[in-house]
Amino acid sequence: MPSSFFFEDASDDELELIRNQEDSSEEDVKEGEAEEHEAGEDEDGEEEYEEEDDDEEEEDEKRKRDADAQSPWDFASYSSSVGEEHARRHTTSIDEKISKAIQHRPVPISINEEEEEEEEEEDASDAETDKQEEYLSEDDEAAEYKPEDATPKPFFSTVDGVSFHADTFMELNLSRPLLRACETLGYKKPTPIQAACIPLALTGRDLCASAITGSGKTAAFALPTLERLLFRPKRVFATRVLILTPTRELAVQIHSMIQNLAQFTDIKCGLIVGGLSVREQEVVLRSMPDIVVATPGRMIDHLRNSMSVDLDDLAVLILDEADRLLQTGFATEITELVRLCPKRRQTMLFSATMTEEVKELVKLSLNKPLRLSADPSARRPPGLTEEVVRIRRTREANQEAVLLSLCTRTFKSKVIIFSGTKQAAHRLKILFGLAGLKAAELHGNLTQAQRLDSLELFRKQEVDFLIATDVAARGLDIIGVQTVINYACPREIDSYVHRVGRTARAGREGYAVTFVTDSDRSLLKVIAKKVGSKLKSRVIPEQSIVKWSQIIDEMEDQYSAVISAERDERALRKAEMEFAKAENMLEHRDEIYARPKRTWFMTEKEKKLVAQAEKDSAGNPAGGELVSADRAEDLKMKEKRKREREKNLPRKKRRKLEAAREMLEDNEGEEEEEDEEGDEKRGRSRGKDKKKQETDKKGLTLKDLGYMRAKAVKAKQRAIDSGKMERPKPDKKQSRSKPRNQPRGEEMKDLFKSDMGEKKQGRGGAAAAAKPRTKSKNSFKSKARYKRR
């Protein structure tokens, strides 16, 4: 059977058990259908006597039930943990601080009256506000935009005969427990990417799939994986599937969806992400879950330090949002995880913006992968309406007023606002709260529980606006999002596609509004040409912008009060943490020092190089040349070759190098602080001067010094041989040894003549030198006469 590609053949007892489970589940499905049919007949009989108002209410309730049934995830368990977290830390939420600031210094903001005035103004200025001009004409778009070649690269296998159409999930050879789960979640007809991927994934082929946002890519890899796990050897507990994602929220969503799809099976799934308890995750990994959904960093941490999991039995590796995982920052971690995985495995890559570069794919050791692209002609959702709001150079300071005017006039609920930075997201959250608008924030400065709580509040529609960074741009399936506002214009094409993909999902309609400054205008044109979308311009009344600018100026004092309260609370929290740490060290000193030190697969220097490469890559605008992951990989290989050369050194030299390196690592923190202070005083130096300053501060190791001297000697010798440099002349000041014109004895006599007597001086005269020297008679006497006879 194809589904047992990597697993042992199931025994007869196991197959019989699975058949019994499927038969029972089929009976349950039939019984449920019969009950629904009977209930439907009763309702049909009663509907004849009901009023029209009751029918509308029932339809609304039915829509709500359908929306709830299709929701793939639920973060309600984290809402209570946020309150416990604030109680444990003795802190208050940002909403409490905002309400307190409003009570102490209220500002007269009458949004309702303002809306009434604006509605009266809209009638007079309809020609201005509703006038929308195409940002790109159709002729320009047809001439300048050229769709990418859909032919597969030689690296990929051919996909002849692959069908992107299926009427029901039963046509995809799925078991009854999975069909029952799909029916419970409200999945009736497979999407094109699901119809193409599920049959191929069941055969164990490597896949590289892409489709538009909201097309059901998660179910496309989750359903075939669960189908294969139904036929696993159940007596052998092991982790057989690893799913990697770039963000924690996406990992939590995938974990929740897999649990819903596997609710009628015995398959276990574990969640391993940062921000949650490490000890609890170790317990989960020791139980050997069949599927692990993780972020790369935390998974490597457990593999190296917890000793509670290994990847020896891994059969399937899945990379969701693969293009982001293969970029700088994640590439080294993904390469390390792939190195730890068995070579005989199935690898699947999924993303809405999959690149055709094969360098990164080759690193993953893919085996003749299939390149699948559903809806290649539709580069964006068909129900998406894209608009731009131009921010003039003289009005860039009023961008917040433009946003508030837009959110109070046109888009009043189910809106995601991408702020660009964490600081901007937090400021907008406070301003929205002071203006009386219900909003939640989502960015990296929040704890993991707070981030998940914000998503849950927005999903339940308890707040109307979600102000987020690009953390929420990828993969999150939030049903009912009507509008996406790019408060900060995206710098890359992929970022724009993923941001606007949060709305108009699964055939629904949605709006995407982008704020464009003069510096972003040319960039957005490039994005529009390559994505293939037609952007239209929206004009906001000047009077509304001026009014909100005045309101924001009046709210600055309240904003400062909230920021001051947060700063004081943060300082108090830091002092409490330091006190608790010192107390814990005194109480559990021996236990803490007995723990092994946590390790990482990269040194501190390599971490800094990768971080710098990621920063350079993020700083380049879209359309420019991005810094690839090869730079970080080359730097890592250079360091590896240096370490290999060090191993061949003598033992004493090697020990000296290790000692020097340890001293440098210990003093890194102090040196960084000195560097920052120096940069603030003197300004940042560039090029060779900066390298020279860093070298002078940090010093050189013996190895580096030896390399530099050897290079200098070789360069000098090459210059002399080529004639570029004259051979150095000997130094005249250097003392030379004089040739000896007299014997050694005469020389010594001349030196010590004053200390010698006349008799000794006479022995060495000219006559003595001319007369041949003869032995004295008494110079040697034989001792033979003294011998015994």
Curated annotation (Swiss-Prot):
Keywords noted in UniProt: ATP-binding, Coiled coil, Helicase, Hydrolase, Nucleotide-binding, RNA-binding
Domain Helicase ATP-binding stretches: 198-372
SMART domains in UniProt: DEXDc, HELICc
Chain ranges of the Helicase C-terminal domain: 402-546
EC code(s) of this entry: 3.6.4.13
Motif DEAD box, residue numbers: 320-323
Compositionally skewed regions (Basic residues) per UniProt: 638-656, 772-789
InterPro entries, per the entry: DEAD/DEAH_box_helicase_dom (IPR011545), DEAD_box_RNA_helicase (IPR050079), Helicase_ATP-bd (IPR014001), Helicase_C-like (IPR001650), P-loop_NTPase (IPR027417), RNA-helicase_DEAD-box_CS (IPR000629), RNA_helicase_DEAD_Q_motif (IPR014014)
One Pfam assignment: Helicase_C
EC top class named in words: hydrolase
Highest taxon in the source lineage: Eukaryota
UniProt GO molecular function: ATP binding; ATP hydrolysis activity; RNA binding; RNA helicase activity
Cysteine-cysteine disulfides: none
Keyword Cell membrane: no
UniProt short sequence motif Q motif, positions renumbered to this chain: 167-195
Gene3D superfamilies: P-loop containing nucleotide triphosphate hydrolases
Residue ranges of coiled coil: 13-66, 110-135, 563-591, 628-677
Region Disordered, residue ranges: 1-152, 611-789
Composition-biased stretches (Basic and acidic residues): 83-99, 628-637, 691-701, 718-734, 743-761
Start-end of Acidic residues biased regions: 23-60, 112-127, 665-678
Domain comment as written in the entry: The Q motif is unique to and characteristic of the DEAD box family of RNA helicases and controls ATP binding and hydrolysis.
Similarity field: Belongs to the DEAD box helicase family. DDX27/DRS1 subfamily.
Name of the molecule in the record: DEAD-box ATP-dependent RNA helicase 28
Organism (species): Arabidopsis thaliana
Gene behind this protein: RH28
